């Protein structure tokens, strides 16, 4: 029997050293290539690397920043990386962290989107996607279950979720209107029955991993202190960064041009992503598929599958939407289809993520001014409940197009149903990872497609 190791004392833990911007740059670049697993997996990777291993930031400060990011529209993991980069190395540190979190996935998705559109009808590729599509349906069901089990804590919140499902599934109400309605209910409900709308949030840290570069008692650095002048300057810069490319697109292609409408549409989408990418996908479907016809329902499902299997935020599926729209509509002419797709993917990524940077750089000093619980979470609690109903509607939408590819008048696709059931059991019962489920179902689909 081996001797019991002696406990690690404070003296045994090496003291943290200052981190250069170059060292941080290399870490954020690495993170951009390994950030698989959706927001939960990405936040877990950052916690392991930055809190436990490198000790760049204490757990309490890490969770305090995460609580703020959870309140914002947009991808919380990317915003958390931006926040920590900003806190450590000022504005450029935040920009570098946020950009590198997204950039690798943008390049990867542009390449995969081109492979998909160019070779999607090849039997091997078609077979893989035949199995992946039912798996994506199961993944969306799992997302509704995961968010619902965390968010629907009482009858009020269950009622909001049910009402949102009816509103979008039966009444076909626009997603922004559902979000607004839920926020109003949460605003008044938080005052009438505050115990029903109390957000869970992330609990305060109870474990220490040793001293950190940014520790619990580390004073707020000068650049992270609130200043009205800094806020006004940032607002002006943000307005310029949005207005200039929008004005150029309008001048070159007109307001009704495809790229201009993509920029405007995804700006609105960026402000509605409460609850993560799954929450905004119904809005993207309503606009990109239903209104603008930039891509088909089947392509939308395939795009989500690609987004699930690449690093970076899942909301990067918008790059796929942009690429397919620009490529198929040939906005630069038939000889420049790839260039049009790549430009469209880059544009929608810019307009989708610009608000996230502004939220962090503008709100960060306000968050750093207090380490107490954030207020005004009741509307967000109600919105999260509504998101569950919206995601369930998305699962119904995917299921319909996958299981009845020719509509209800056609036959049920039994192999797809069986693959979806296998994926659901693997995800919900055996807790298997999303990527391995997609790979397994893709291989099953390939066998079925080649055999039949």
Where are these regions (language model features)?
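Multi-pass membrane proteins that catalyze or facilitate reactions on polyprenyl-/lipid-phosphate substrates
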Residues: 1-72, 76, 83-310, 314-452
């Amino acid at each position: 029997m081996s001797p019991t190791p002696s406990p690690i004392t404070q003296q045994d833990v090496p003291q943290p050293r200052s981190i250069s911007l170059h060292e941080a740059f290399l870490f954020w670049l690495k993170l951009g290539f390994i950030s698989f697993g959706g927001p939960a997996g990405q936040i877990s990777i950052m916690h392991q690397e930055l809190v436990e291993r490198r000790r760049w930031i204490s757990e309490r400060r890490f969770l305090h920043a995460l609580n703020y990011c959870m309140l914002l529209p947009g991808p919380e993991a990317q915003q958390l990386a931006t926040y920590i980069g900003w806190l450590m190395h000022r504005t450029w540190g935040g920009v570098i962290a946020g950009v590198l979190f997204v950039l690798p996935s943008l390049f990867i998705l542009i390449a995969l989107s081109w492979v998909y559109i160019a070779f999607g009808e090849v039997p091997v590729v078609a077979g893989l996607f035949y199995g992946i599509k039912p798996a994506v349906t199961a993944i969306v069901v799992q997302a509704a279950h995961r968010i619902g089990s965390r968010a629907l804590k009482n009858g009020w919140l269950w009622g909001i979720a049910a009402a949102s499902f009816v509103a979008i599934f039966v009444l076909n109400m626009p997603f922004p209107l559902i979000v607004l309605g839920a926020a109003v209910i949460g605003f008044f409900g938080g005052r009438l029955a505050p115990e029903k709308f109390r957000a869970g949030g992330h609990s305060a840290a109870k474990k220490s991993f040793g001293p950190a570069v940014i520790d619990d008692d580390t004073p707020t650095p000068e650049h992270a202190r609130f200043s009205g002048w800094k806020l006004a300057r940032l607002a002006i810069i943000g307005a310029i960064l949005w207005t200039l490319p929008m004005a150029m697109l309008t001048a070159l292609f007109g307001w009704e041009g495809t790229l201009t409408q993509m920029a405007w549409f995804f700006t609105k989408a960026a402000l509605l992503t409460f609850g993560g990418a799954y929450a905004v996908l119904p809005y993207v479907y309503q606009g990109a598929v239903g209104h603008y016809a930039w891509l088909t329902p089947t392509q939308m499902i395939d795009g989500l599958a690609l987004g699930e299997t690449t690093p970076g935020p899942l909301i990067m599926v918008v790059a796929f939407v942009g690429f397919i729209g620009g490529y198929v509509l040939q906005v630069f002419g038939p000889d420049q289809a790839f260039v049009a797709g790549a430009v469209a993917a880059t544009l929608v990524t810019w307009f989708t993520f610009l608000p996230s940077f502004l939220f962090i750089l503008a709100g960060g000093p306000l968050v750093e001014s207090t380490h107490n619980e954030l207020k005004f979470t009741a509307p967000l609690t109600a919105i999260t409940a509504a998101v569950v109903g919206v995601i369930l509607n998305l699962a119904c939408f995917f299921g319909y197009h996958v299981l009845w590819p020719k509509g209800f008048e056609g036959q049920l696709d039994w192999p797809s149903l069986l693959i979806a059931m296998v994926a659901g059991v693997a995800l919900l019962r055996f807790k298997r990872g999303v990527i391995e489920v997609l790979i397994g179902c893709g291989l099953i689909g390939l066998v079925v497609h080649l055999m039949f």
